[in-house]
UniProtKB/Swiss-Prot annotation:
PROSITE patterns for this protein: CLPX_ZB
Quaternary structure and partners: Component of the ClpX-ClpP complex. Forms a hexameric ring that, in the presence of ATP, binds to fourteen ClpP subunits assembled into a disk-like structure with a central cavity, resembling the structure of eukaryotic proteasomes.
Record-level GO cellular component terms: HslUV protease complex
UniProt-annotated stretches for the region Disordered: 408-429
UniProt-listed InterPro entries: AAA+_ATPase, ATP-dep_Clp_protease_ClpX, ATPase_AAA_core, Clp_ATPase_C, Clp_protease_ATP-bd_su_ClpX, ClpX_bact, P-loop_NTPase, Znf_CppX_C4
Protein name per UniProt: ATP-dependent Clp protease ATP-binding subunit ClpX
Annotated ranges, domain ClpX-type ZB: 1-53
SUPFAM superfamilies on file: Glucocorticoid receptor-like (DNA-binding domain), P-loop containing nucleoside triphosphate hydrolases
Record's compositionally biased regions (Basic residues): 413-423
């Protein structure tokens, strides 16, 4: 080979191989890289990425540690938090145990969450997944229909989990799926109907195999299955399913059962008001869910039943002020970005909580109430340079006009973060 040809011969800048020794050589600004080096780099990056995202279930947190973490984000619901902590701990302990090839194989126990709207069902499931660092997906049962009808197939629930796991199937197979509004797929009548119930009993039947544990075929693009498309295979045996719903009306079923079983001179007399405080749901039996419209096989796939209490005024006030991401703290931060101090007095917090109770929205409705109160002032504050402090009182819920305090000197100054002092929520929030 001539010296001129040697100069023209291109080489990989990393391994030194010439373009004749590799399949492809890609040029950059003054450098070249061959296909072999690209493949090697890709393997190194993928290995490091897998190490970063691997679900570590060997150092499983204990139930007390799980509950302590839940306490930071979820106010009240002590019984529910304890039950969930134990259930989740046992679920992932079971996964570790079944890899040891013991004679006894532990079966999966999915969870059914019952509680009023805005009591914290979704938040509990989200917080659990965040703490355990596992993939998490939320699905809405009202969008699901039986295969072959307009709507979503049940396999689309698993697609959301796979997507949230960055298409890492092994990681997704140890995730958590929360199916909301599960009470909406109850069959329309307690008795089996001769007409097809495609969004009720049909969906329950379709969910059975996934809940129990099966290798499901998931269409990668979602939507309906087509015979000629490729599917993602995922084993649902180790996926924890948490199904939640308000189950409006099940309290009447429980009340009828307990009333008929507590007749006579020795019967315990309890007022309806006392039963409404959350004690009624704790008496729920599988037969009550059957009468509500869940089929026996579906009830059997959800052996752990956790009930949540209806939030009272005290609990709602704590939700407004105590969690790490409490609403009051969020709005204070928003105003602080405009160099304005925001203060909610105790009467205002009570009024907001009472309004949420009147609307029957629970904690979910708190943001809407505050947003409605603060809309006008949040519109005006950026333009009013003389306002240094905003105080929200009880009247503000109706008038939408909080008390405004002018800044010293007629112009507000940047707010400096306070150090060493903690404001008491009991005095002002």
């Amino acid at each position: 080979m001539s010296k001129l040809d040697e100069k023209k011969q291109l080489k990989c800048s990393f391994c030194g191989k010439t373009q004749d020794q590799v399949r492809r050589l890609i040029a950059g600004p003054g450098v070249y890289i061959c296909d072999e080096c690209i493949e090697l780099c890709s393997e190194i990056i993928n290995d490091e990425f897998e190490d970063d995202i691997q679900v570590d279930l060997t150092s499983l947190p204990k139930p007390t540690e799980i509950k302590t973490y839940l306490d930071q984000y979820v106010i009240g619901q002590e019984d529910a938090k304890k039950s969930l902590s134990v259930a989740v701990y046992n679920h992932y302990k079971r996964i570790n145990s079944n890899t040891n090839n013991d004679d006894v194989e532990l079966q999966k126990s999915n969870i059914l969450l019952l509680g009023p709207t805005g009591s914290g069902k979704t938040l509990l499931a989200q917080t659990l997944a965040k703490f355990l660092n596992v993939p998490f997906a939320i699905a809405d049962a009202t969008t699901l229909t039986e295969a072959g009808y307009v709507g979503e197939d049940v396999e689309n629930i698993l697609l959301k989990l796979i997507q949230n796991a960055d298409y890492d199937i092994e990681k997704a197979e140890k995730g958590i799926v929360y199916i909301d509004e599960i009470d909406k797929i109850a069959r329309k009548s307690e008795n089996p109907s001769i007409t097809r119930d495609v969004s009720g009993e049909g969906v329950q039947q379709a969910l059975l195999k996934i809940l129990e544990g099966t290798v499901a075929a998931v269409p990668p693009q979602g939507g309906r299955k087509h015979p000629h498309q490729e599917f993602i295979q995922i084993n649902t045996t180790n996926i924890l399913f948490i199904c939640g719903g308000a189950f409006d009306g099940v309290d009447k079923i429980i009340e009828r059962r307990t009333r008929t079983s507590s007749l006579g001179f020795g019967a315990e007399i309890q007022s309806k008001k006392e039963k409404d405080l959350g004690k009624l749901l704790k008496d729920i039996m599988p037969g009550d869910l059957l009468k509500f419209g869940l089929i026996p096989e579906f009830i059997g796939r959800l052996p752990i039943v956790v009930t949540l209490d209806k939030l009272d005024r005290e609990a709602l006030i704590k939700i407004l002020t105590e969690p790490k991401n409490a609403l009051v703290k969020q709005y204070k931060k928003l105003f602080e970005l405009d160099d304005v101090e925001l203060e909610f007095n105790q009467e205002a917090l009570k009024g907001i909580a009472d309004e949420a109770i009147n609307r029957n929205t629970g904690a979910r409705g708190l943001r809407a109430i505050i947003e409605d109160m603060m809309r006008e002032i949040m519109f005006d504050i950026p333009s009013q340079e003389n306002i240094g402090k905003v105080i929200v009182n009880e009247d503000c819920i109706k008038t939408k006009k909080p008390e405004l305090i002018e800044a010293e000197g007629g112009k507000r100054l940047p707010i400096k973060p306070k150090k060493g002092k903690k404001r008491k929520d009991s005095e002002t929030a």
